[in-house]
Amino acid sequence: MISPQGVAVATLLILGVVHGSLIDDLKAKFSSSSSGFGASMFSNSGAKSSFGGGFAMPKLDASKAAMVHSSSSHKGHHQSSGSSSNTHSLTVVGADGKNITENSEKKDGYNKESKVDEANENTKIKSADGSVIETGKSHNKSSDDASSYGLEKSSKTYADKNGTMLSSNTNKINNQSRSAALDEGNEFVNQQNADGTFLRNNTGHKNTDEHLSHNVLDENAQMSIGADGTSHNITNRKGSVGDSHNAASDAHSNFESLDAQGNKKSQNYSKKAASASGSNADFESNLESLKNADGTSMSNSTGNFNNTSYDKATAEEVMSKKNVNADGTSSMEASHAGSNSSKINSASGQSSDLSMVGPNGIKSHSTSNKTDNYALDEANQSAGSISEQIGKNGQRSLNESSIESGRKAESRNNTAADTLDSVDANGTVSSSHSKSASGTSLDENHNKTHALQASVDEHGNMKNHSIDGSYRNKKTGEFGNSEMSASIKNADGTMSQVNVKNDTNRNTYEAEKSALEKNHEKNSDGTFKDESKGSNSRVNRTDGGSNLAVGSYSVGKGGVSSNETIASSNAFNTSDAESNQFDHLHQKTANGTEITHAKDSKQVAASANAKSSLDTSMSAVDAKGNKVDKTSSQAADSHDAISASSDVDAKIVKHADRSESISNDSSNQTASEHNDSSKQSEHEKRQNADGSFSDVSSNSAKKNAVKDATDVRQNAFANVDAAGNSVSEVKNSLVENHSNDSDASSDSKIHSKSVDGTELTDAKHSNVSTSHLTEGQLAQIQKKLAMADGSVVMSNDNSHITHEKSRADVDAGHKAHLSKADGSSTDIDEGFKHHSDLESRGEGAQKQRYQKLGNGTESSMDVGYEKSMAKGGDQTSSHKKTLAKDGKGHFTETKDGSESHHKIDDKDVKQHKDIIQM
């Protein structure tokens, strides 16, 4: 290996030899010459001196040199600019009264500037033992700046003695600029020693940057005025303004070495980044107006715009290290990190406005406006690392870790508005206005993690442990609403108007989550352990609704009018969720025991809700003065829900002596419910000009409720010992519940009077209610004992309970009264009632036994009972009454009635017992 001191000594020796040779050569060549030299001898003209060709310079072979050094550099600065300008002017004053004026101006120019700074340097040194050192470095820095501008203006006017005038104007701007820069550099060292060892190092970077901008505008206007008072104007304007910035950077470093002992090292590193940002705005507007001699006119305006801005960035960093040693050991390490982000905002729109005035009072005006807005904000990150070590005796270790995360938010919104108003020659006024808005949104988040640790020791024992997790959620939304109104008003006072309003919305939410942990161990003695446990869950939710409102109103001739409204609404929400948990183990211990154990749980749930309503109304008056009013209303809602869960716990244990035990426990639960209700009402009222009227109304309501639930469980156990004796036990149970309730009611009323004096009053009502409940339970226990000598003992116990209950109620009635102008009348009164209820219970149990002894003796027993009970009854009653009068003091009356009763009371008990002995 070449030392720095050796390099310095070698360099001095080389310079000393060259310097001594030059002195000897000069002494030999100029010993007899005068010491006076002309000034032209050292001039820069490049011409040969009077001494001829001078020294004969020797040519050296660089491949055989002990040292070679070369360098170069370049620096430059360039700048330029330019501009131009043109003007024009014209004025004419004519004898005939015509005047003309023209003016124009045009300017443009540019500026450019560039700079450069470059340098390279390389050195190579050889030692006598064959060692070589190479070094080098370079850099390059440059910049470019350029800009340009342009301006153009012109104007023209014309006028004559009749009053006619014309004019036009233009204005244009065009400005551009660019700025860019570069900075890069590299440096290296390469050392190769005679003994085969080496060292290499290389570093570098590169940075770029660029800016762009522009400003463009184009305007023109034209105007004309006629001698008759007419005019016509046109204006146009459009332009664009924007800038952008782009930048990037890149840096790296690489290192590698080998020492005399054979140890090798390497290291690599890089870092990159980039960004882009900017904004841009485009716009355009147009205006035209026209005025005629007859007083008619027109004005039209339109425009649009589009604005955008953005900001984006990326970054990355990577590192790796590796060591390989001569003794076989090694280590490795690497890491990575990266990110990206993006932001975008944009807005655009269009607009128009048109007005017109026609003959005979005709007018119209219309407008339209639309907008569109968008936004995005997104970012993601990730990072990870890994490392590994290898030891002398087969030991190894590994470590990993990583994480990822990100988010995203996005939205879009739109609006629109339109109007139209007009007046026709008859004086009719029409109007139509509408507006709407809608939008969507998105919001997301996620992350993910991972970790791993693994190792092997010198005895071959292995361990592996990992943890993983993830999460994600997502939200979405959307909405829309609109309004519209239209009307017509006539000169005779008649009119009509309509209004409509509507809105909707919907939102969703989703989420997921999971976690997992694993542990694995395997040892050289045959023992092991495998364990995994974790959980996962998800949830989904949705909600939304809509509303609608409509109204109309009109007025006709002769007092005729009408008014109607409709309103409806709907709303809903749903949800469902699920989750799971587990823990699994498989293990073998040093004493030969093997264990298998699994636990699993699961839960699910879902629900849904809904509501709706509808309301209407109507009122009207006809030409005769008859009036009518109607209203109706409806409403309904519902609810549904279900849920379920399950659990399992299973375990098996095996021992080295062949004894074994097994257990298995499980349970399942379910539940559901449903509820719904509804209401409805109607009312109609009529009032006639002749004094007759009618009033009719009705109402109804309903309710329902249903519930169900179950619970199922089982416990099982078994064991066998080393001698062959076994015992087992199983337990089962079941519980069920069911209920159903309902209610319904209704009523109606009528009140009317006719022209001849007849009057009617009528009322009805009805109520119905029911209820039903069912419950049940089952239980069972089974046991068995078996001995190695053949003895067996068995038992079986069963029991059950049932319960049922029901109820019903009914109530209905009807009353009516009819009277006439002659004094006669009729009355009706009817009614009905019913009530019933019934309840029943039952229970039972059974015990069974069996025994067989080793000497052959057998015996059995069977004992049980059953109980049942029923209790309840019903009662019903009704009546009817009528009364008729003739208005002269005579009447007829009828009465009917009925009533019934029933009662139930039952009980039963049954028992049995059987014993058998052999």
Swiss-Prot record:
Sequence ranges of Basic and acidic residues compositional bias:
103-127, 515-533, 648-660, 673-688, 738-765, 800-814, 830-846, 883-918
This protein is called what? Uncharacterized protein F59B2.12
- The annotated regions of Low complexity compositional bias extend over 79-89, 270-281, 430-441, 632-647
Per the record, the domain of life is Eukaryota
Q: Where is this region: Disordered?
A: 66-150, 226-283, 326-481, 515-548, 594-707, 737-774, 800-918
Query: Which ranges of the sequence are coiled-coil?
Result: none
Q: Where is the composition biased (Polar residues)?
A: 326-354, 363-372, 379-404, 534-545, 604-619, 661-672, 689-702
